[in-house]
Each structure stands twice: as structure tokens, then as C-alpha cells.
Amino acid sequence: MNAIRTFRRTFVGGYMKIFDEGWGKAKQRMKTAIKPGPGFDVGWNNPNMPLNNYDIVIIGGGVMGWSTAYWLMHKVPRKARGKIGLNVLVVEKDPSYTRASTVLSVGSIRQQFTLPENINMSMFSSHFIRNIREYLSVYEDDPPDVQFNPQGYLFLATAEGAEQLKQAHDTQVALGAKVRLFTKRQIEVKFPWLNTDGIELGNYGMENEGWFDPWLLLMALKKKAISLGVNHCHGEVTDLVVEAKPGVVEGRLCKRITHVKVKMPNSIQYQNVKAGHIINTAGPWAQDIAKMIGIGQEDPMGLDWELQAPLPVEPRKRFVYVFHCPQGPGLDCPMVVDPSGMYFRREGLAGNYLCGKSPEEHEEPDAKHLEVDYDFFNETIWPKLANRVQAFEEIKLRMAWAGYYDYNTVDQNAIIGTHPIYDNLYLANGFSGHGIQQAPAVGRAVAELLLDGEFKTLDLTRFGFERFLRNEPIREKNIV
Amino acid sequence: MNHLVLGYVGLVIGVIVTKKSMVWRVGQVGSVLLMLPATVLVNMNMTISNVSYMMTSDFVSLGLTVLSIWLLPLMLLASQQHMVSESLIYQRVFVGCQVFLTGALVLAFMASDLLLFYIAFESTLLPTLMLITRWGAQKERYQAGTYFMFFTLVGSLPLLICLIGQYQMVGSLALDLSYEGVFQLSYLVNFWWVGCILAFLVKLPLYGVHLWLPKAHVEAPIAGSMVLAGVLLKLGGYGMMRVSLMWGATAMLSSEVFLALALWGIVVMGGICLRQTDLKSLIAYSSVGHMALVVGGVLTGVAWGYNGAMVLMIAHGLVSSCLFCLANLWYERSSTRNLSGSRGLIMIFPLISLGWFLMSLMNMALPPAINLFGELVAMVALYNWSPYSIVYMSLGAVLTAAYSLYLFGMSQWGNTMKNYKNLYTITSREYLLTTLHLVPAIYLIFYLGLMF
């Protein structure tokens, strides 16, 4: 007995303990000595780490990223998915989407644009949303539903703006949008709660316009894309590695993005993902991605002059306020857009309304944080609300939130296409507030551009990056 | 000839200890230098080495040994582009894997003892598995590695058992002593022979057990594809030749079953190739078709069949390896292997189109390429075995020509893809690679001593 106790005390309690301590310390020292990265395994396998080679890397897991991923897999026949070089990785740095534009958006869809491409994109998207069960159903799962309320948009115009509204209406009708012009008298009859002082003309979308839940659309796209074989990881893209080789043109190098450095969350571990094609759908932070490869910086050698044109996307903060008005317009309240840019719509069935306004250039809020400025509501929006609808004089502000527009500072329209220098970089940025309603169409367009080499269904070449090089901005007049 | 294998051992050590800037130089220059002792082998007589009693070489092993030695610097040349960004230790392991693989192959082809051959045969498995699963491109490479490993292992276990059985019956496994064949007259000796040959049929591969090949070839990196298509498949053919001679004609009773599968395989693989959308997959399936003809040639048992199979193996090694290099060249620039995504290349890369052209023509056995001579000789042997086989062989030849032209036409001609604006020029490294494949292939046209 005594011998066993002594044995246990000296051997197990003594030598083994010393050994375990020493071995543990040695392991710790080894771990800190070896610099983490793709070259060495630190001893703990991060299950979130992506593989080291993908054919297509989509930077940004918002609605644009997942829409593109879905359409890429959708275009490939089933037995060839993943086999003929279509491994897709979606990298998202915040899967809870706390600051993403997609989930903080109001989720409206309208065909009332002036550019034909915008109108066509929204028409396809509304068709997509209406038939979302055929597109995005996953086997053995509940069919997706985005709560589409096709209530319509009512654009109001004063006497000065009536001519432009009529021209826009003609463009929209020519492309097949179901919109109808209302005179002042007709508006008064249809919407008796609306105050038509100063209003000359109204353009109302009868079908395919309204609002839906952007979170549900994002989740439906994500689920379907994952079921088709798209890989995703939670990580942040910190760098893009470029290789430059001599090409056919004398003196200019052919540049290609070869690797994407994806950093793991809360860690210094990163993976050097070898990427064949890279799609930038990073939303408001698209310019950070572009800056990593010198887009927008002076080229010291002066050879690649196209690099001087930056990707003109920056985050702009916009507020959305929800208020309650018991005597308000009621169930037939569409999304009303005031000539001043203020908009409001019904939210739910309990007498709540949602409103907002794009601030003027001089009163742009600080985009470093998502704090809500209630003075903006009290001083700028509420007077206009009260002016437009009598009942809105007595309201109670329930809640508000702020989100980012991925604002295209040049012409507030989408940037879709390849970059002239890096031709395995695809861009889908700068939607400036009307991205969620163009997401299905944009995803399909980028997928066609990547897989077929050109746009097949909707020709969006006018939205390419080259317009900044040629200084030919495309202006959209109906910006909300 | 033992010093040749020691040379490779030294090269592995050299790759491990040299500094970072010299790793690839040591690998490439060393492997080129190791070709000089290989020229000693080119005397086509059966030689027993005076350095070691374990190594012999006769005309069967000569061609394949030189082929595997020749392919090592080409493999290193082809893969240095995509290995540039890896960390140093992984580069060392990569180069070391290939050198070790070539050393094991040389040992296998020059072994004079069947058990040594078996050991070398098995030891080529591990470096290839490492190449495929670690440096392959898609995530399907894990499944490809599993298929490759298990097919080969399941096939080679009967080989070990039957070799040991043969040792028990005959008393020795040395090759130069056993040209007589096991002299038994019962039909049971057939099963011993089938057990031996199963490993090689899986390795070749025969049509029914070929599933691992498209997966492994497609998922492997360029070096892996080159060595797989160029040499490892030929291990199967070589092994079949050695083992069949050992057991004798009485053992090859069921050769007709495998011959039938092989003949059918030629036709079916021709058809499958015409339906492929992946560039590498097409070349991989064409390998199965060519090797099916090799199986046919060997299993006839006559000298002409052996000659034809030998020449076909050497020719196919060079042509297939070059085609993989060319496909990889395009893949490195465009990140796609899809045939419909790589059209009109003759307008972008005219000179390397010459490489595509010559290799596609040689693939479909156009005279005067040696592929034709190999096919012709093997076909004559098969016709001698059965006149009805001419149906399958001619159909196979037509389909081979069809898919070779399809490969060339789809990739080179047609409307050039518009979304590739920034493709860098073909480097001289890639031209050298293609030339080094073409030069032996064209030189061998004039070296008829290979066959007769």
C-alpha cells in the first residue's frame, strides 16, 4: 500500500507532472514562434478556413454577392457543377450583417426610372420575386417567400417637373412597365388623404412595384446557392495579390489578380486563396477592395493610365424613420415620393408608416457610424410629411435606423462590368440606393459576363467602368 | 545502373538541403545531368549491371526508363509557375516528391527481380498521392486521390500474393532466370496469372477498372498529370509484359476476356471523348483508349504485339504529357478548362498552336508519327488473334481521329473569346517544354530500331 502510494506520488504526481508542464510550455513556445499563415498549421485547424484554390471568389456576401453566386451555379448544367471549373467562394466579413446595406434597406422595388437599363432590370427582378418559388426553392425545405407587397410607387411632380415625369412615363410604358399617369383631380379622387397643393401630375405603378423583405431575399438566395454547391466563409479580404507579366503590347504589363488573402475573424490566421476570377460586391466598401490593387492611385511608371480612375463608391448614411399615425392614410397608401425627395409608405397593418429622405449635399451625415439623427426627422422630414398628408401632423415616432448607400459619387448608377486593366476582376458596385431591386438582374448579368463573355439577356455595357475613363456619366433622373 | 538510382537519392537530399533560390535549379539541372548515365543504357542488349546484381535492362525497359528520366526535368519546368507563391518547405516537398517518384520508376523499370519491381511499383503510389491531394486544383482532388489509391491497392494485393506463390512454386523471382514459364498444365495456373495481372490492368487502365483515371488526371497538378499519363500508366504495361512471360502461354487462358474488354474500351473511350467538356478530361479519357490498345497488344502473346505495345507506350507518354502541358498553359492564363470557354486560341497564341497541332495529329496516329507504327503493329497482332477484332479497332481508330480533331478544332479555331484581354505571352519556358516533348517524338520516327 505504502509502496503504491509512494509510487503514485513520485511518478505520477512528480515526474509526469513535470513532464506535462514542460511539454505544455514547449508546445506554447512552438506555437508562438511559428508565424501563422498558410505555410504552417498552428496545430489547430480553423474549420472556417477556405481552401487554397477557387475558380471564382466573390468578395462580399450581400444580396449582390449571393445573387451572382446563385446565377453562376444556375447557368451551369447540374452534372457539371463544381467539375468544369466552377468552384465559387463567397467571402463575407460579417455574417450577422449588422452594417450591410442589404438588410438595412427599405426593400422597395419600382420600375419608374428614366434609363431603359434600370427599368428592364427592375422588371426582371419583380418577375423573379413573383416567381421566387420556381427559382429559389430548395428540396425538402419550405418554399421561400419575401413578403412582396405590390402596392406601387406614386411619384408626384410639380408643374416644373411634370414634363420630365411625363417623358419618364413614356419611356417606362414603351418598355412594358405598368405605370399610369394621374392628373391632380384623379389623385384627389384615388387618394383623398393626400394634399395635392402644388402637385400637377402623378405617376403610379399599377403592378410589379412595391416593397418586400430584403433579409428574406438574401437568405433565400443564400440557401439556394449553398444547395447548388457554392462555398462560403466568414473572413475579411485584406489584400489582393497581382502578378504582372509582359504581354503583347510593348511596354505594358499584363496584370492579373492571382490570390486573395482572406483573414480569419479574431485571428491573425489567413489563407492565400488562389482565385481565377474575382467579383467585387463589397457594397459601400468597394473602394477599399479596389484600392488594394492600385485602382485610383497614380501609377508611378505612368504606363497604366487607366489605373488613375478610382472606383467612385463611398458609403453614405441614410436614415429611415418609423412612426405611428392612427388616423393615417390606411391600407391603400403606396410608396409616395414627394417632389422634394421625401418618401413615405405604409409599414404593416397597424397604422405604422416608414419614411425617409436623401439629405442634400451640404447636410450629408457622418458615415463613420450608424447613429440616427433625430433632428433631421424633426426639422426636415416631418414638416414635409405634415404638408403632404394632413393626418401626419399628429404622429408618434416609433423607431429609426440608419444604413449605408453604396453611393456612386459620379452618377449614382450601377457599375457593372470588368476592369480595363485587370480583366479577371468583375465589378458590381455603386447602386446608390436602388441595389436591392436590381439584385437578381445584376447577378444574372455578371454571371453571363463571366461565363459567356458578354451580356446575353440585358445589355448593360453602358454601366461599365469605361464610362469613368471616357468621362461619360449616365445620369438617372428619378433618384430617391 | 544502380548508380542511376543513387543519383536520384542524392538529388532528393540535394533538394532538401539547398537554399531557397537553388531548390528548383538543383532539381532541374540535376535531373538533366542524370540523363547522361541513361545514355549508357541505349544499347538494346540485355545487360546485367556490373554495379549491382539487382538491375538489368533490356529493350523493354530501356525505352520506358529513358522516358521517365526524360520527363522529370519537363515536370519541374512545367510546374515552376504555379509553385512560385508556395512556402519553401512545400516547394522542397514538391520537388522532392517528383524526384523520388522518378527514382522509384527507374528502379521499377530496371529491376531484375519481380519483388523489387513490386516494391518500386508500390512506392510510386505515395508521392503521386501526395501530388494529387495536396497540389491539385479543385476540392474534388480528395476523392480523386482516394479513388486512385484504393483502385491501385486493391489491384496490387493479389499481385503480391501471386508473386509469393510463384516464388514458392519456382524458387526464384529473378527475371533473367524465368523465361521458361511455370511448367504446369492444369487450368488453375490461370488464376495465378490473373491475380498477378490485375494490378497492372488497374494501372493501365483496362476499360472496366478505369474509373480512377479521369478523376486523378483532371484533379492532379500539371506535374502529376504529366507523370501519371507519361509513365505511371506504362508501369502497368511493362508489368504485364514481364509477368506474362513468366507464367507462360498456358496461364493466359482468360486473356480473351480482357482482350474483349480492351477492344470494347477503345471504341467506348472514343465516344466518351467526343462528349467531354473539360479539356483535361478529354485527354485523360484518350489515355484510357490508347492504353486499351496496349493491353490488346500485350495479351496476344506474340512478339509483334509486344513490340507494338512498347512503341505505343513510349509514343503515348510523350504525346499525352505534351497535351497536358498545353492544356495547363491555357489554364494558367484563363483559369478555365472548359472547352467552350477556350476557343479560337490560334488567334491569340499562334506559335503554341503549332504544338497543339502536331500533338493532336500524333494523338490520332497520323503517319509518320511513331503512334501510327505502334498502333499498326499491335493491330496486326490482334487481327492475327481474331479477324473480327478489325471491326472494333477500325471503329476505334476513326473515333480517335474524330476526337483528336475535335480537341484541336474546339480549342484553336472558332470565335475567339472576348472576355480575355490581358493574356500574357507564351514564355520561352513553355516553348522549351513543348519543344522538349516534340523533339524526341520526331526523332523517334527515324529510329526504327526501337521496334525491329
Curated annotation (Swiss-Prot), chain B:
<keyword id="KW-0520">NAD</keyword>
<feature type="transmembrane region" description="Helical">
    <location>
        <begin position="309"/>
        <end position="331"/>
    </location>
</feature>
<keyword id="KW-1278">Translocase</keyword>
<feature type="transmembrane region" description="Helical">
    <location>
        <begin position="144"/>
        <end position="164"/>
    </location>
</feature>
<dbReference type="Pfam" id="PF01059">
    <property type="entry name" value="Oxidored_q5_N"/>
</dbReference>
<dbReference type="InterPro" id="IPR000260">
    <property type="entry name" value="NADH4_N"/>
</dbReference>
<feature type="transmembrane region" description="Helical">
    <location>
        <begin position="345"/>
        <end position="365"/>
    </location>
</feature>
<dbReference type="GO" id="GO:0042773">
    <property type="term" value="P:ATP synthesis coupled electron transport"/>
</dbReference>
<feature type="transmembrane region" description="Helical">
    <location>
        <begin position="252"/>
        <end position="272"/>
    </location>
</feature>
<protein>
    <recommendedName>
        <fullName>NADH-ubiquinone oxidoreductase chain 4</fullName>
        <ecNumber>7.1.1.2</ecNumber>
    </recommendedName>
</protein>
<feature type="transmembrane region" description="Helical">
    <location>
        <begin position="114"/>
        <end position="136"/>
    </location>
</feature>
<dbReference type="InterPro" id="IPR003918">
    <property type="entry name" value="NADH_UbQ_OxRdtase"/>
</dbReference>
<keyword id="KW-0830">Ubiquinone</keyword>
<feature type="transmembrane region" description="Helical">
    <location>
        <begin position="221"/>
        <end position="241"/>
    </location>
</feature>
<feature type="transmembrane region" description="Helical">
    <location>
        <begin position="282"/>
        <end position="304"/>
    </location>
</feature>
<feature type="transmembrane region" description="Helical">
    <location>
        <begin position="432"/>
        <end position="452"/>
    </location>
</feature>
<feature type="transmembrane region" description="Helical">
    <location>
        <begin position="88"/>
        <end position="110"/>
    </location>
</feature>
<keyword id="KW-0249">Electron transport</keyword>
<keyword id="KW-0812">Transmembrane</keyword>
<keyword id="KW-0679">Respiratory chain</keyword>
<dbReference type="InterPro" id="IPR001750">
    <property type="entry name" value="ND/Mrp_TM"/>
</dbReference>
<dbReference type="Pfam" id="PF00361">
    <property type="entry name" value="Proton_antipo_M"/>
</dbReference>
<keyword id="KW-0813">Transport</keyword>
<keyword id="KW-1133">Transmembrane helix</keyword>
<dbReference type="GO" id="GO:0015990">
    <property type="term" value="P:electron transport coupled proton transport"/>
</dbReference>
<keyword id="KW-0472">Membrane</keyword>
<dbReference type="GO" id="GO:0031966">
    <property type="term" value="C:mitochondrial membrane"/>
</dbReference>
<comment type="similarity">
    <text>Belongs to the complex I subunit 4 family.</text>
</comment>
<dbReference type="GO" id="GO:0048039">
    <property type="term" value="F:ubiquinone binding"/>
</dbReference>
<comment type="function">
    <text>Core subunit of the mitochondrial membrane respiratory chain NADH dehydrogenase (Complex I) that is believed to belong to the minimal assembly required for catalysis. Complex I functions in the transfer of electrons from NADH to the respiratory chain. The immediate electron acceptor for the enzyme is believed to be ubiquinone.</text>
</comment>
<keyword id="KW-0496">Mitochondrion</keyword>
<feature type="transmembrane region" description="Helical">
    <location>
        <begin position="182"/>
        <end position="202"/>
    </location>
</feature>
<dbReference type="GO" id="GO:0008137">
    <property type="term" value="F:NADH dehydrogenase (ubiquinone) activity"/>
</dbReference>
<feature type="transmembrane region" description="Helical">
    <location>
        <begin position="29"/>
        <end position="49"/>
    </location>
</feature>
<feature type="transmembrane region" description="Helical">
    <location>
        <begin position="59"/>
        <end position="79"/>
    </location>
</feature>
<feature type="transmembrane region" description="Helical">
    <location>
        <begin position="4"/>
        <end position="24"/>
    </location>
</feature>
<feature type="transmembrane region" description="Helical">
    <location>
        <begin position="390"/>
        <end position="410"/>
    </location>
</feature>
